[in-house]
């Protein structure tokens, strides 16, 4: 039961207080009136009697109370009510619950009103909104005898809670949006939607997250409930609903033309449709989306084809003003009794892919291929397929064409999609390079060649050839009137290269060039250049700018746009982790990985898993971090070599979470060296700063040099942090913590504050020690309960050397001396020597007592 605390308390107070003698709950069918009313009466306790109004009992005087009153033959209403009242009150104080009080007969309603007026019983009743109600029932709340409580549908958060309680697991945010919109927050509808989707197999659990893929299913029980309302509608209104089923929303003029103005007005008056303004035009929508599913079930195949044909004929005579208009027309043509030309399906496929609705784009592209479309249709089909994980079919579709038979425009289009599929979906960098080289050798037109040069930049950056990526991108950006796809490929390849090089300002300029042409680019591809922009902003320390950029592409609501939704979650999770908002980051990234479970999105799962590993490590969840790193490593290769230094940083954080500080520092330093060799100076700075946060004092000089190369204030603060750490400068570390917090890098701030506390302790300054420790604790809490090496050391100051502390932590984690020696690459005798000295300093007699002390337990 999803609690409605405010309403529940209002009912309980009314049933026990000195004011009204109860409450009446009003609301639409299925919003949870009865459930809440019964829960409230059960909580109050005592003698509770429930009755329910029905259509069949409405014609029987005192029909709902008949089973309580017993057999009575009097025909005088006054005598009849007196006997009923006596029977109801015979057992003392009573709470009378009346479900569907709007269906009470007049005598029952009058009896209920008299009991309320006389305060002879406590009453709780439910009434459906929008229906005729007996006057006596209305008087219950109008005259103040009962408290009226209007029960609204569930909010989206309440709807998610309800569905998750039914499923026993986490619900995907994208699915939550779809279900909430389909149900309108109606608890009854939600329950049936979940049951119907489970039965149909469209609601399934992936990586622990429940996802809805495809149309929302309707159970037979819910269909029957809704059909009762549908069957009561006159024929003209039904015609309106039937047309709307296949074309929602539809222009009001078109609907009036097809169904008649009077029918449309009647449908609106009955509350089954609504007329709303959309882009300065009036359109017709269902008042409740599930009506469309019920109407769809009632129609046969022939009727549905005929209705689609009527709609297609009407809309094809009107101008196409948007991609949505074209997509709607193509959808109607697909399964209608009318025919449409190849050009419509190709254009609609491009529109759908541009809007990131890949399943729909695939349908249109297949229709174009079936109508003997050439390489253009095949290219559209492959673009839709590769992102959905059908990489083999995409390759087979494109490989069936002989490049020698294609003109240069076709070659560029065919080659770009095939290279994309081979590199990012299939992970075959060698084959991708071969195809790209083949196509480039056959193209001579400068503008077409620019597209392939831009593509070469994108390939180079993924293969960690940073300088090549930048050079190719610069060539495109300096080409006058370069085609949109050329500019976009260059904005991604060059933009990511610049971000990694630490040239954040130039990367943002590249990103803007990409934004200028993004209307020409496939919907999901836009995330590639946006990801580069988000990284550039976080590397420079512009966290608010990164947040704005990451949330710019969040308006995805169609069922087929789940991959775009997942990509947007990666962007948001990336910013969350950079800011230290780890619980939010973990939720966003885990949901993204579940949504992007298809092989077509494999390239984007790599960086997502790295961010996830960092988040888990920061919270001390080493097992989860190790799992994320293993998942990333499985998908590694030359096609994702650009992320190798960041993978090593994630491994360093994992080692830190496991308490092995020496290996953690070594891994971080190796990551810095690898990044330096690749000219990834922003990543080099990140790796060096990671080592400093683990306690490495030797990185100040390198970070100072990088501060002169890398844009933004973040690296400046990192450099000052490293200098203060090496000098055991407590005030300097406090200042670094303040600067990190101002920037929005909360975990860096927490680590700097924790190291400041240790420095103040070393200097014997207890006041500042306490202040810095309090700051570190506050920031760690803001990060979701962070547990880093610096924070752990500040929270538990011990008279141990760094190596002794490291080995003691591993003992506390349950490792044997041999396992510790293997992990730290030292001898067992060395481990034993450090343990011996640690036990003496901690005044314990053996390793078990030392382990207990480190875990905060009482030594045995």
What would you call each of these model-derived segments?
Residues 107, 114-175, 182, 189-192, ...:
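Alpha-helical sensor/transducer elements of the RecA-like P-loop NTPase core
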Residues 29-31, 47, 158-166, 170-363, ...:
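Short secondary-structure boundary elements
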Residues 22, 36-40, 261-263, 283-286, ...:
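Extended alpha-helical scaffolding segments used for macromolecular assembly and cargo binding
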Residues 26, 31, 35-94, 103, ...:
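Conserved phosphate-binding/catalytic loops and adjacent sensor/switch elements of nucleotide-binding enzymes
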Residues 19, 397, 405-409, 503, ...:
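Helix-coil-helix junctions within alpha-helical repeat/solenoid scaffolds
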Residues 77, 102, 140-141, 171-173, ...:
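Internal alpha-solenoid helical repeat scaffolds
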Residues 305, 309, 323-330, 342, ...:
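Start-of-helix signal in alpha-solenoid helical-repeat scaffolds, especially tetratricopeptide repeats
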Residues 1-14, 80, 803:
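N-terminal pre-P-loop "Q-motif" helix
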């Amino acid at each position: 039961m999803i609690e409605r605390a405010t309403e529940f308390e209002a009912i309980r107070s009314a049933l026990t207080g000195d004011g009204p003698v109860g409450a009446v709950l009003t609301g639409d069918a299925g919003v949870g009136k009865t459930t809440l009313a019964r829960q409230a009466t059960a909580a109050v306790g005592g003698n509770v009697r429930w009755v329910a109004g029905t259509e069949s009992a409405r014609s029987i005087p005192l029909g709902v109370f008949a089973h309580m009153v017993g057999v009575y033959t009097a025909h005088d209403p006054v005598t009849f009510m007196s006997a009923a009242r006596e029977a109801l009150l015979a057992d003392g104080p009573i709470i009378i619950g009346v479900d569907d009080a709007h269906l009470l007969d007049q005598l029952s309603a009058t009896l209920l009103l008299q009991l309320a007026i006389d305060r002879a019983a406590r009453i709780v009743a439910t009434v459906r909104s929008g229906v005729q109600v007996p006057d006596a029932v209305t008087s219950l709340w109008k005259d103040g005898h009962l408290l009226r409580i209007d029960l609204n549908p569930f909010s989206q958060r309440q709807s998610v809670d309800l569905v998750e309680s039914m499923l026993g697991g986490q619900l995907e945010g994208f699915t939550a949006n779809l279900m909430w919109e389909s149900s309108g927050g109606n608890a009854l509808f939600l329950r049936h939607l979940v049951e119907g989707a489970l039965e149909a197999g469209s609601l399934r659990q992936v990586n622990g997250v429940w996802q809805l893929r495809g149309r929302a299913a309707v159970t037979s029980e819910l269909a029957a409930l809704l059909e009762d309302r549908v069957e009561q509608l006159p024929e003209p209104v039904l015609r309106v609903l039937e047309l709307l089923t296949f074309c929602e929303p539809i222009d009001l003029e078109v609907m009036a033309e097809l169904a008649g103005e009077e029918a449309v007005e009647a449908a609106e008056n009955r509350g089954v449709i609504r007329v709303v303004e959309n882009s300065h035009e009036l359109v017709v929508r269902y008042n409740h989306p599930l009506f469309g599913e019920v109407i769809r079930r009632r129609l046969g195949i022939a009727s549905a084809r005929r209705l689609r044909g009527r709609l297609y004929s009407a809309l094809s005579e009107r101008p196409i003003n948007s991609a949505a208009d074209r997509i709607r027309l193509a959808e109607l043509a697909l399964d209608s009794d009318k025919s449409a030309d190849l050009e419509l399906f190709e254009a609609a496929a491009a529109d759908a892919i541009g809007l990131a609705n890949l399943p729909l784009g695939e349908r249109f592209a297949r229709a174009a291929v079936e109508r003997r479309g050439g390489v253009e249709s095949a290219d559209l089909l492959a673009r839709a397929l590769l992102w959905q994980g059908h990489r083999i079919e995409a390759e087979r579709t494109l490989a069936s064409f002989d490049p020698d038979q294609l003109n240069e425009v076709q070659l560029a289009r065919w080659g770009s999609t095939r290279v994309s599929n081979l590199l990012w979906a299939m992970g075959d960098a060698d084959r991708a390079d071969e195809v790209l080289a083949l196509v480039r050798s056959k193209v001579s037109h400068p503008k077409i060649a620019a597209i392939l040069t831009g593509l070469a930049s994108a390939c180079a950056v993924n293969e960690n050839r940073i300088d090549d990526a930048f050079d190719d991108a610069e060539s495109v950006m300096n080409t006058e009137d370069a085609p949109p796809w050329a500019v976009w490929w260059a904005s991604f390849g060059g933009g990511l290269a610049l971000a990694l090089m630490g040239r954040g300002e130039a990367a943002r300029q590249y990103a803007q060039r990409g934004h200028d042409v993004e209307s020409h680019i496939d919907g999901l591809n836009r995330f590639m250049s946006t990801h580069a922009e988000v990284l550039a902003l976080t590397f420079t320390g512009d966290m608010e700018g990164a947040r704005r950029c990451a949330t710019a592409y969040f308006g995805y609501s169609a069922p087929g746009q789940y991959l775009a939704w997942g990509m947007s979650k990666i962007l948001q999770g990336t910013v969350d982790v950079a800011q230290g908002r780890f619980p939010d980051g973990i939720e966003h990234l885990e949901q993204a990985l579940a949504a992007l479970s298809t092989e077509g999105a494999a390239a984007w799962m790599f960086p997502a898993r790295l961010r996830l590993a960092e988040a888990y490590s920061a919270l001390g969840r080493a097992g989860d971090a190790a799992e994320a790193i293993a998942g990333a490593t499985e998908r590694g290769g030359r096609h994702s070599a650009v992320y190798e230094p960041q993978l090593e940083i994630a491994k360093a954080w994992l080692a830190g979470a496991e308490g092995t500080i020496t290996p953690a520092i070594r891994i971080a330093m190796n990551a810095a060296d690898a990044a330096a060799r690749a000219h990834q100076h922003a990543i080099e700075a990140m790796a060096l700063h990671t080592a400093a946060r683990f306690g490495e004092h030797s990185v100040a000089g390198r970070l100072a040099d990088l501060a002169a190369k890398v844009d933004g204030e973040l690296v400046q603060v990192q450099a000052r942090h490293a200098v203060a750490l090496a000098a055991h400068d407590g005030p300097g570390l406090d200042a670094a913590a303040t600067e990190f917090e101002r920037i929005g890098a909360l975990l860096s701030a927490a680590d700097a504050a924790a190291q400041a506390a240790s420095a103040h302790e070393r200097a014997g300054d207890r006041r500042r020690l306490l202040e810095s420790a309090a700051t570190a604790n506050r920031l760690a809490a803001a990060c979701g309960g962070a547990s880093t090496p610096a924070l752990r050391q500040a929270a538990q100051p011990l008279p141990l050397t760094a190596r002794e502390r490291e080995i003691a932590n591993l003992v506390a984690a349950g490792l044997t001396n041999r396992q510790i020696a293997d992990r730290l690459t030292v001898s067992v005798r060395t481990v034993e020597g450090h343990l011996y000295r640690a036990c003496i300093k901690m005044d314990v007699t053996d390793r078990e007592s030392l382990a207990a002390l480190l875990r905060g337990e009482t030594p045995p």
